[in-house]
Swiss-Prot record:
This is DnaJ homolog subfamily C member 7. It comes from Pongo abelii (Sumatran orangutan). The gene is DNAJC7. SUPFAM superfamilies: Chaperone J-domain (SSF46565), TPR-like (SSF48452). Pfam families: DnaJ, TPR_11, TPR_16, TPR_8. The modification N-acetylalanine is found at A2.
Length: 494
C-alpha cells in the first residue's frame, strides 16, 4: 500500500493571498506536519485528527485530502478514504498520488473497473510510475477472478469460486460482495462455521446487509435449524424485498418444515402410507438441503420398515448415510433392517460403525447380538434342513425328521449315479444331525443361543445317522425299501 504509506509534504502552488490567508496556510501546514509525525508513528487516529484540522484551515489543498485518505486507508475505512481521494483529484487533476489512492480505494472495495480507470489516469500523468503499473495489473487480475467465479458459480463448482474469491480478496479486502459470494459457496460446500463467520463479520459492520442476513439464514437452513433460518430470510427480505435468493430459500424452508411436520404427525398416528407420501414430497423440495434430506430419508426408511418393505427401507437409510455419513440413527435403522432380512455381515458392519462413533452399552449389545447371529448363520441351519421354523413343537420335529429321512435315505437312491448317491448320503447325515440336536431340549437351547456345540462336548464328527434311523423306525429289520419299477418304492414297517 505504497500510496497509502507515504504522506505528501509539499503544498500545492497557490496564487498570492491576503495576510490572514497566509496565516491560515501556515497554521494548516503546522497541523499537517503534526499529522505526518503521528502517521510516521502509526498513530493513525491522531494523524486523521490533525489532517482534518489542516483541511478545516485550508479546504482547497489537494494534498491534505490525499494525506487524510492515506490515513483512512490504513484504518481500513476505504469508503471514506475514497471520498477524500476523489476530492483531492477534483482539486488537482494532475495529482498522481491522489489518482493512485483513488484507484487503490476502488480496488479495495471491489470496484476493479473503476480502479483501472484511476490507474490509467495515473499512468497518463506518469507513464513510468511502477506502482501504477503494478496496481493496474492487480485490478485486471481481480476482474478476471470475478469473471471466472461467475462462470463457475453457474456450473456449481463452488470450490473454484471460493479459490477465486480468496485471490480477489487479497487485492480487495473490503469488498463485501466478494465475501458474500465466498460465504454462500462455503455454505453450499457444507462449511457452515466458515460461512457464518464471514457473514457475521459483515453484519457487525452493517447489520442491515441483506446478503449477509441471507447467508446466515442459509447456513442455519442447511444445518436443519429451519425455524431460525426463516427468521433471517424474513429479515433479509425486510431489508431488500426483491432479494430473489432469500425469497426462494424462505419459501423452501417453510415448505420443508410443514411437510416434515405433517409426515411426523401421520407417522405417530400410524398412517404410514400418508407419512410415506409426505416424506417423499418433502424430499423433492430442495436437493441441496443435505442434512434435512438425510433425516427425511431415514424417516421414510422407518415408514418402509413399518410397512415391511425392508429392501426399500435399506435403500432409504443408505441414501441417508450417503448424505450424512455421521448420521447414527440411519445406521441403526439400516442395521436393524439387515438383521430382519438375515444380512448379518452388513448388520455387523453398521453396528461396528455406530459403536466406533458412540461407545455406549446399548450399541455394544447390538453389535454383540449381530455378531452372534452372524456366527449362527454360518453353521448348518438345522431348522432349514428339517424344513421347520424355530418355534416347531417336538411332534413337528419328529414328523419332519420322518419325512426327510425317508426322502434322503441311501437305500432309496441305490440305483442312482454315484454323484447323486453321495449327495443324498450327505443330506441323510445332515437330517440325522438336525434331529439329534433339535429333539434334545438342552442341545436345542445351546444351538439357539449360538453356542458351539462341539465345544459343549457334542462331537458330531463321529455321528452315525443310521443309528438314529434304526432307533426311530424300530431297529434292524424293522424297515426296508423295495423297488417296484423306476422311481417307485414300497415301505415296510415292522
Amino acid at each position: 500500500m505504497a500510496a497509502a504509506a507515504e504522506c505528501d509534504v509539499v503544498m500545492a502552488a497557490t496564487e498570492p493571498e491576503l495576510l490572514d490567508d497566509q496565516e491560515a496556510k501556515r497554521e494548516a501546514e503546522t497541523f499537517k506536519e503534526q499529522g505526518n509525525a503521528y502517521y510516521a508513528k502509526k498513530d493513525y487516529n491522531e494523524a486523521y485528527n490533525y489532517y482534518t484540522k489542516a483541511i478545516d484551515m485550508c479546504p482547497k489543498n489537494a494534498s491534505y485530502y490525499g494525506n487524510r485518505a492515506a490515513t483512512l486507508m490504513m484504518l481500513g475505512r476505504f469508503r471514506e478514504a475514497l471520498g477524500d481521494a476523489q476530492q483531492s483529484v477534483r482539486l488537482d487533476d494532475s495529482f498522481v498520488r491522489g489518482r493512485l489512492r483513488e484507484g487503490k480505494c476502488h480496488l479495495s472495495l471491489g470496484n476493479a473497473m473503476a480502479a483501472c480507470r484511476s490507474f490509467q489516469r495515473a499512468l497518463e500523468l506518469d507513464h513510468k510510475n511502477a506502482q501504477a503499473q503494478q496496481e493496474f495489473k492487480n485490478a485486471n487480475a481481480v476482474m478476471e477472478y470475478e469473471k471466472i467465479a461467475e462462470t463457475d458459480f453457474e456450473k456449481r463448482d463452488f470450490r473454484k469460486v471460493v479459490f477465486c474469491m480468496d485471490r480477489a480478496l487479497e487485492f480487495a479486502p473490503a469488498c463485501h460482495r466478494f465475501k458474500i459470494l465466498k460465504a454462500e459457496c462455503l455454505a453450499m460446500l457444507g462449511r457452515y462455521p466458515e460461512a457464518q463467520s464471514v457473514a457475521s463479520d459483515i453484519l457487525r459492520m452493517d447489520s442491515t446487509n441483506a446478503d449477509a442476513l441471507y447467508v446466515r439464514g442459509l447456513c442455519l437452513y442447511y444445518e436443519d435449524c429451519i425455524e431460525k433460518a426463516v427468521q433471517f430470510f424474513v429479515q433479509a427480505l425486510r431489508m431488500a424485498p426483491d432479494h430473489e435468493k432469500a425469497c426462494i430459500a424462505c419459501r423452501n424452508a417453510k415448505a420443508l418444515k410443514a411437510k416434515k411436520e405433517d409426515g411426523n404427525k401421520a407417522f405417530k398416528e400410524g398412517n404410514y402410507k400418508l407419512a410415506y407420501e409426505l416424506y417423499t414430497e418433502a424430499l423433492g423440495i430442495d436437493p441441496n438441503n443435505i442434512k434435512t434430506n438425510a433425516k427425511l430419508y431415514c424417516n421414510r426408511g422407518t415408514v418402509n420398515s413399518k410397512l415391511r418393505k425392508l429392501d426399500d427401507a435399506i435403500e432409504d437409510c443408505t441414501n441417508a448415510v450417503k448424505l450424512d455419513d455421521t448420521y447414527i440413527k440411519a445406521y441403526l435403522r439400516r442395521a436393524q433392517c439387515y438383521m430382519d432380512t438375515e444380512q448379518y455381515e452388513e448388520a455387523v458392519r453398521d453396528y461396528e460403525k455406530v459403536y466406533q462413533t458412540e461407545k455406549t452399552k446399548e450399541h455394544k449389545q447390538l453389535l454383540k447380538s449381530a455378531q452372534l447371529e452372524l456366527k449362527k448363520s454360518k453353521r448348518r441351519d438345522y431348522y432349514k434342513i428339517l424344513g421347520v421354523d424355530k418355534n416347531a413343537s417336538e411332534d413337528e420335529i419328529k414328523k419332519a425328521y420322518r419325512k426327510r429321512a425317508l426322502m434322503h435315505h441311501p437305500d432309496r437312491h441305490s440305483g442312482a449315479s454315484a454323484e447323486v448317491q453321495k449327495e443324498e448320503e450327505k443330506k441323510f447325515k445332515e437330517v440325522g444331525e438336525a434331529f439329534t440336536i433339535l429333539s434334545d431340549p438342552k442341545k436345542k437351547t445351546r444351538y439357539d443361543s449360538g453356542q458351539d456345540l462341539d465345544e459343549e462336548g457334542t462331537n458330531m464328527g463321529d455321528f452315525d445317522p443310521n443309528n438314529i434311523f434304526k432307533a426311530f423306525f424300530g431297529g434292524p429289520g424293522g424297515f426296508s425299501f423295495e423297488a417296484s419299477g423306476p422311481g417307485n418304492f414300497f415301505f415296510q414297517f415292522g
